[in-house]
């Protein structure tokens, strides 16, 4: 009877020992799984943090680029406004030049009709160049002229010559005044003559077939 109880105690002890051993194994497996899960969690966390850092740097880069783009856009808008102002100013200047040119051409045509004077348009406004015809009973005479608008002495001499032949010089003076104004306002340069010499008023007898004037 005592022997049977002893065997039963040993059997129970073995079972408890086995159960404890199995429980220890399960605990070790659980710890291993927890360790693996923890390691994976930390790896994922590190990856997420690195990705967050990259995204932050990328966001800062994009923000800097946006600031640069905004500054560039503002510069272009300012440049566009400046170009628009310059364009309007240029259009206004061109309109003023056209108006002056129209007035100048009107004077030229009126002068030609009133005095028989032809003007070289290409020489204006820096120079007053052309030829006038004096008609009288003794024969027609051509008076060519090529004067800078700043040559006051030459212009006065020509006006006196025209006036002495009973030619109205009002349109002539208006023409010279407009040419002088345009020359000063728009900074036209006065072409130099090849000989740099003062041009005298020359009378040419039209009755001679060999005399020709080319403007």
UniProtKB/Swiss-Prot annotation:
Coiled-coil ranges per UniProt: 43-114
Gene this protein is translated from = Spc25
Q: Which cysteines are joined by disulfide bonds?
A: none
What does the UniProt record say this protein does? Acts as a component of the essential kinetochore-associated Ndc80 complex, which is required for chromosome segregation and spindle checkpoint activity during meiosis and mitosis. Required for kinetochore integrity and the organization of stable microtubule binding sites in the outer plate of the kinetochore. Participates in SAC signaling that responds specifically to disruptions in spindle microtubule dynamics. The NDC80 complex synergistically enhances the affinity of the SKA1 complex for microtubules and may allow the NDC80 complex to track depolymerizing microtubules.
Instruction: Share what the entry says about its subunit structure, partners included.
Output: Component of the Ndc80 complex, which is composed of Ndc80, Nuf2 and Spc25.
Listed under GO cellular component are: Ndc80 complex; nucleus
- What does the UniProt entry say about where the protein is found? Nucleus; Chromosome, Centromere, Kinetochore
The similarity annotation says: Belongs to the SPC25 family.
Which protein are we looking at? Kinetochore protein Spc25
GO BP term, pick one: meiotic spindle organization
Chief location of this protein?
nucleus
Write out the entry's keywords from A to Z: Cell cycle, Cell division, Centromere, Chromosome, Coiled coil, Kinetochore, Meiosis, Mitosis, Nucleus
């Amino acid at each position: 009877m005592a022997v049977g109880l002893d065997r039963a105690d040993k059997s129970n002890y073995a079972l408890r020992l086995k159960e404890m051993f199995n429980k220890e194994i399960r605990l070790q497996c659980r710890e291993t799984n927890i360790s693996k899960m923890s390691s994976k969690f930390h790896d994922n966390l590190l990856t997420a943090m690195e990705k967050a850092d990259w995204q932050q740097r990328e966001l800062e880069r994009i923000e800097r680029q946006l600031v640069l783009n905004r500054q560039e856009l503002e510069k272009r808008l300012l440049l566009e406004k400046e170009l628009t102002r310059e364009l309007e100013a240029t259009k206004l200047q061109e309109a003023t030049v056209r108006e002056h040119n129209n007035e100048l051409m009107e004077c030229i045509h009126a002068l030609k009709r009133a005095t028989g004077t032809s003007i070289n348009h290409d020489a204006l406004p820096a120079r007053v160049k052309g030829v006038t015809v004096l008609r009288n009973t003794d024969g027609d005479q051509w008076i060519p002229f090529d004067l800078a608008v700043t040559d006051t002495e030459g212009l006065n001499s020509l006006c006196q010559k025209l006036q002495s032949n009973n030619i109205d010089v009002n349109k002539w003076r208006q023409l010279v005044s407009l040419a002088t104004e345009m020359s000063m306002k728009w900074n036209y340069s006065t072409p130099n003559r090849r000989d740099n010499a003062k041009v005298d008023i020359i009378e040419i007898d039209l009755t001679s077939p060999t005399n020709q004037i080319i403007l």
